[in-house]
Amino acid sequence: VSTSNDRIKVWTRIDLTFRASTKFNNPYADALVWVDLEGPDFSRRVYGFWNGGDEWVVRVLANAPGEWHWTSGSSPKDAGLSGQSGRFVAESWTAAELDANPNRRGMIGASANGRGLQYADGTPFFLLGDTWWSLPSFRFPLADKATATGTLGPQSTLNDYVAVRKAQGFNCVGLIAAQPAWANDGKPNSLQMDDGTWVRAAWKQPGTQSAKDMHNEGGRPFEFPGKVPGFEDVFPDMDRINPDYFKTLDRKIDYLNEQGMVPFIEISRRDSGQCWQKFHDWPESYARYVQYMIARYGAHITLLSPIHYDYYEQTIPAEDYNVPINLAIERYGKPPFGTMLTANPNPSTLVNFGTDSWIDLHQSGNVREHYTYWYLTEMFEAERKPAINGEPYYAGLHQLGEPYPLRVPPDSEDDRIYVRSGLYGSFLSGGLAGFIYGAEGIWQSDVEPESLHKMWDSFGWESGNQVQHLKTFATVEGQRYLELTPCTEMVVPNKTGPGYAYKGWSYCAATPDRSLIMLYFEADAPMEARLRGVRPGDRFLPRFFDPRNGNWHDPGEAISVPRNGVLPLPPRPDAMDWGLMLQRL
């Protein structure tokens, strides 16, 4: 972070701080601050946010080398907020500096063909994420940067967890910025008003019947008392924000960015929707919060989501969230420095928000078994935007409300098979931009003595270590994977076994000219398989991939497509899951 008025590096955040002369009753809602920022091929109004007391901050950066200048404004006009100006000069990073932290390459955006992701300078970004929904809370304490040891246990810090995942090739973590009504307050974790309105649908804190605590050293994200009759001490006033809570989150986001990690920030979970809509000025109140979070984190290297819509129950319809989200974008514009907008959806961003929406990065989410990977194919065919599976099967999954019917011992081979099904089945179904992993104990950040799986133990599970092999599989031919089109029906058979499972199915994706064909066979898929849709007489070099260790086997003997155009595939090494590449000779 820089507050300098002279020389900085490109893609370095600058906090421009202003002190208001006016004493506002509710600064969060009563004033708007901005700077008009001008630079090389850039001219944009960048909005700021209230940061507590009389302080407002506008966060800016330079996306290109050269001279930049800004002038501030506010509504209502204020002597301390309006009419200020400044300048700075941006310089490029050296090659060594770029190698030290890839986030210095700029914001994440879509690849040239719209199927993958890349940094602003064009360097490919294959997203490999982990699910740390509770990162803003005390459950992920941030230590002195010099003390991270990588040793996992009750004393573990955010620094330790980042070190572990960074060493395993992860480059992204997902988090929910605010769980407004969640606290271990002695009241049930799921609360409804007499008329059925949902007050909260929280995760249960182990050892209690109440909701999980989600505060941090700055407190909780919004102020009390709230406006919901009878629940003023449970559901806060969503029109009065607590900047101290977000200052703590700032430091964690800063640390992630310094470590080369890209946070995927979801600003709120869907269970706050009914009381927010019913007892506040909707859509204005939610649109204000959307803009606040874009202003606060739009100059970090992040992915931003205006709603964590992981389920369509205990909330308002997705189209009702669309109203304030679109209002914020129409009024203030999309994030000024190119931050992609996305969301965790159920079952997909396409189903919930449609085509030609504010979505920049499509996701499937909170749907798990292999029959759901098709949603990625549907998005692939609907429009040319990158896509990922953002919430597949959780390693060690025990229950989601009810005990999970397919649960297996955590970190068993079956558990790892389930995870790998999600990794490779999703990729070949159209999720070419990457994948977000999750594990029991980590996704809900269990630290209590009564927890079934404590999060520091779950970080040691082998399935997390195997996630990095997806990139090895995808990039065997460099960036050619971005040319792949899902075509599972080319491989026969491809669906032996039930849809509500992770075994027995096969997947296929190929380049349009069929010169590169990638396949994945789940465990227990038939050993004999054939490939149709290839040209008689063409010859292919087969090569198997072991998703357990990331090793490509030596190529086998060339195989030729017979006159009927149906190619018998070589049997995989055993009945476990395997990847296969066919290169046309």
Outline where the language-model segments fall.
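Non-catalytic, glycine-rich low-complexity segments
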Residues: 1-41, 46-48, 87-94, 501-510
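Aromatic- and carboxylate-lined catalytic core of secreted/periplasmic carbohydrate-active enzymes
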Residues: 2-6, 23, 27, 123, ...
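Short tyrosine-centred short linear motifs in exposed loops/low-complexity segments
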Residues: 9-12, 54-56, 60-72, 76-78, ...
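Active-site mouth of glycoside hydrolases
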Residues: 32, 102-105, 111-372
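Extended acidic/polar, glycine-enriched regions
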Residues: 36, 42-114, 135
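Surface-exposed loop/edge segments in extracytoplasmic proteins
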Residues: 40-47, 549-557
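Short proline/glycine- and polar residue-rich coil/turn motifs
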Residues: 50-52, 559-565, 572
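Extracellular glycoside hydrolase catalytic/binding regions
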Residues: 288, 295, 302, 308-457
